């Protein structure tokens, strides 16, 4: 095991060189591992990817029901699907002299001239840029004749339309390194180099590395005495593709796809460190990755005012749906919490 030189003052220059050499060797190991990660792997494996949910495609159309309000979900600041003022039974039927009248959450008539909510010639409701305040119950009154000879029929169709956002999801990693003495500045230097290399490794994916924790502890090992170990915890999250260092224009720019690629690169990076150490003929550097200590967890978080609820929103189980009246979410939790005094959609406080 290589160690720092701690001799008399006249050997200070040699001590500095020896200590610097140890840090350099550990850094070189990181650089080589990062380079090898770029080499395509011939081994593939199948995993379950987190699924993004979108209902904003033009091909999706929502039909109503006379029995209950039909739920529809629109991504925040996006165009909505067409909300049809017909039932499934009437969708393909011939309607004579149909007329449509839409009312919004507060009983206001949705006019044809509205810039954000438009009524098509066939009576469909379409939102161009859905805002949080647009969430709520929408009602359409349909009048029509089945045939020219029959009398006018009237239907009332209700829709519960919710804003939703994709979750703020990220990977959280933990790893342990054999370290220099816990009061050594070389542990801090190594930490900085490790984060720099990981950041460069993920630069093309528009992903961000954030250090959550870095602690040095003395660990008693069975049959190995005491040793110093660095405990790292860091997160990997996707940046906005428009704001990242390198703009992502590839067809696989969805955040969860970029995060999955980042996870694979990080796993390979740490595995390469183990392989390189295994091929070394000389002694191990003082700072090195401890095999098998890399752990990761996939974390979903919703923005304040939004939450996931499989029971309430079974058609959008992985969406962060705006909190309904009677609930709120004050921070980046997963679920909306009960609040009887909350009367608005998207509440962030409970008064």
Curated annotation (Swiss-Prot):
It is found in: Cytoplasmic vesicle, Secretory vesicle, Acrosome; Cytoplasmic vesicle, Secretory vesicle, Acrosome membrane; Secreted. GO terms for biological process: acrosome assembly; binding of sperm to zona pellucida. Keywords: Cytoplasmic vesicle, Glycoprotein, Membrane, Secreted, Signal. It is a peripheral membrane protein. Belongs to the zona pellucida-binding protein Sp38 family. The keyword Membrane applies. PANTHER family: ZONA PELLUCIDA BINDING PROTEIN SP38, ZONA PELLUCIDA-BINDING PROTEIN 1. SUPFAM superfamilies: Immunoglobulin. This is Zona pellucida-binding protein 1. It comes from Homo sapiens (Human).
